[in-house]
């Protein structure tokens, strides 16, 4: 065997010369106690609030309570695999999630990990989950419509791009259905490929997995998943994941807002996020306040919803519109969380169980629902026709309450009640059938101009269906004119009246 001393010594000299002296310092701590999704950790002296830490086995956590002798960490995963004495490492990074167009069409958890079995997400950009909302100067007033495709909302409670509109109601009143229809209504804009298309983000908090799966299935079947991102922190996920999911979703939506594009985010629902946050806070021994929620539960929701904004032209004029959902108990909107969120948002859509069971669907209580942005978020054509419907419905509700007692009503009151009943019928709409704005304008125009007054209430839906079919074939120029001009000129008004007269004669 030939031993070459010179060669061996050269290799050794080379290794000694290139020996790396830069040792890696990572700050570690030890688990003192663990339970209920909370770990108390000793050490980690320089950890930041909201920093991601790592437990053995790759389980992540977030440092929330920085106390004098220990750190309270919430665990994003099962605490079964963590035991006393385990080593905890700092990552040096505040909690981040992947963002960008690569997430479109995917279902992810609160940390941005895919849970839909379609492989990894190759997004190069990561953003912090909890960032400061834009200030006053970078913003602009809300002035562009965000069309939901639902007549009752687009006509009476218009939502603009960059607005926060609360959807509030008891369980099983159709809150998620409104969000689903709004998502589906963005499809024509995506198919047309214009700049005004909206990307949709849906955050499911504390829901059943089957419900989320059903939501995704409907989006997929109707071709709406390609422009949507679903963040799911289901009922079986730990409370910290349910707390984090809305912030993660908001960050993903902000990516589009900051690029000068438009995004719509729905939080379904924030009551469950508040419950998850209450659980975490109580386990971290933070002092409880009203209804045992922590003192900063208002700040939890306000800092989240303030991130929805319409940015100024200098910032690219992008927008993020938020549709938070709150579930009430027995129509009690004066509870703690509902009143908080009502005061943060720019209006609310009230859904009522009674209306739902009367067959008025969407079950929107038009009297209690408001949009504080109002007609600034409507096209002129819609303002022209919807202005009078609000007043007529308000008078109708007032009269209907009195009419229960009196049998002999004068002709004017009778006329008002008849018109109101038909307008209420006109605002009904089946699920998964969002209407284009110009079609809504035509239908409401027919309602407020007395074309329904002679019909039986049961025929209103059939009449609406017939009018739209007729105009899509015979009156295409009228619909096109309303869509392009965004207003009803005298010329278009004349044509529309003539078309409605012609159809009304043939309708039987």
Swiss-Prot record:
It is an enzyme of class 7 (translocase). The record marks 369 as: Required for activity. One of its GO terms (molecular function) is ATP binding. It comes from Allorhizobium ampelinum (strain ATCC BAA-846 / DSM 112012 / S4) (Agrobacterium vitis (strain S4)). Belongs to the ATPase alpha/beta chains family. This is ATP synthase subunit alpha. Its EC number is 7.1.2.2. GO terms for cellular component: plasma membrane; proton-transporting ATP synthase complex. It is found in: Cell inner membrane. Produces ATP from ADP in the presence of a proton gradient across the membrane. The alpha chain is a regulatory subunit. Its main location: membrane. The keyword Secreted does not apply. It comes from the Bacteria. Keywords: ATP synthesis, ATP-binding, Cell inner membrane, Cell membrane, CF(1), Hydrogen ion transport, Ion transport, Membrane, Nucleotide-binding, Translocase, Transport. It catalyses: ATP + H2O + 4 H(+)(in) = ADP + phosphate + 5 H(+)(out). SUPFAM superfamilies: C-terminal domain of alpha and beta subunits of F1 ATP synthase, N-terminal domain of alpha and beta subunits of F1 ATP synthase, P-loop containing nucleoside triphosphate hydrolases. It is a peripheral membrane protein. ATP binds at residues 169-176. Pfam families: ATP-synt_ab, ATP-synt_ab_C, ATP-synt_ab_N. F-type ATPases have 2 components, CF(1) - the catalytic core - and CF(0) - the membrane proton channel. CF(1) has five subunits: alpha(3), beta(3), gamma(1), delta(1), epsilon(1). CF(0) has three main subunits: a(1), b(2) and c(9-12). The alpha and beta chains form an alternating ring which encloses part of the gamma chain. CF(1) is attached to CF(0) by a central stalk formed by the gamma and epsilon chains, while a peripheral stalk is formed by the delta and b chains.
């Amino acid at each position: 065997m030939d031993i070459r001393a010179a060669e061996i010594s050269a290799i050794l000299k080379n290794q000694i010369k290139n020996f790396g002296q830069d040792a890696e310092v990572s700050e570690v701590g030890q688990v003192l106690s663990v339970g209920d999704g909370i770990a108390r950790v000793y050490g980690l002296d320089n950890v930041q609030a909201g920093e991601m830490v790592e437990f053995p086995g790759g389980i992540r956590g977030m440092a929330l309570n920085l106390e004098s002798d220990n750190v309270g960490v919430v665990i994003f995963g099962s605490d079964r695999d963590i035991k006393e004495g385990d080593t905890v490492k700092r990552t040096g990074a505040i909690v981040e999630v992947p963002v960008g167009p690569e997430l479109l069409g995917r279902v992810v958890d609160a940390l941005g990990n895919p849970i839909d079995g379609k492989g990894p997400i190759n997004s190069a950009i990561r953003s912090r989950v909890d960032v400061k909302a834009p200030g006053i100067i970078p913003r602009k007033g809300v002035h562009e419509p965000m069309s939901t495709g639902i007549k009752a909302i687009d006509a009476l409670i218009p939502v603009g791009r960059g607005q926060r509109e609360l959807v509030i109601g008891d369980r099983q009143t159709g809150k998620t259905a409104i969000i689903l229809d709004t998502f589906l209504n963005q499809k024509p804009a995506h198919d047309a490929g214009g700049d005004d298309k909206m990307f949709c983000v849906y955050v499911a908090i504390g829901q059943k997995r089957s419900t989320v799966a059903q939501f995704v299935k409907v989006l997929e079947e109707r071709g709406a998943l390609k422009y949507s991102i679903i963040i799911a922190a289901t009922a079986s996920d730990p409370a910290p994941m349910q707390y984090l999911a809305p912030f993660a979703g908001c960050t993903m939506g902000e990516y589009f807002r900051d690029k000068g594009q438009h995004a719509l985010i729905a939080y379904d629902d924030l009551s469950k996020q508040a419950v998850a946050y209450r659980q975490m806070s109580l386990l971290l021994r933070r002092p409880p306040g009203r209804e045992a929620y922590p003192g900063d539960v208002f700040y939890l929701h306000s800092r989240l919803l303030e991130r929805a904004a319409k940015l100024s032209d200098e910032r690219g004029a992008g927008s993020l519109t938020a549709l938070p959902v709150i579930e009430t108990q027995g129509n009690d909107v004066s509870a703690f969380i509902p009143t908080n969120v009502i005061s943060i948002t720019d209006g609310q859509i009230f859904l009522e169980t009674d209306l739902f069971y009367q067959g008025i669907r969407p079950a929107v209580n038009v009297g209690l629902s408001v949009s504080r942005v109002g007609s600034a978020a409507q096209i002129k054509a819609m303002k022209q026709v919807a202005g009078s419907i609000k007043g007529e419905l308000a008078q109708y509700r007032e009269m209907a309450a009195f009419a229960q007692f009196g049998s002999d009503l004068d002709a004017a009151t009778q006329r008002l009640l008849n018109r109101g009943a038909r307008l209420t019928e006109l605002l009904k709409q089946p699920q998964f059938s969002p209407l284009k704005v110009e079609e809504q304008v035509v239908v409401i125009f027919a309602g407020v101009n007395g074309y329904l007054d002679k019909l039986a209430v049961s025929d209103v839906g059939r009449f609406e269906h017939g009018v739209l079919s007729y105009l899509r074939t015979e009156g295409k120029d009228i619909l096109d004119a309303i869509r392009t001009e965004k207003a009803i000129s005298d010329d278009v008004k004349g044509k529309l009246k003539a078309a409605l007269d012609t159809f009304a004669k043939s309708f039987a």
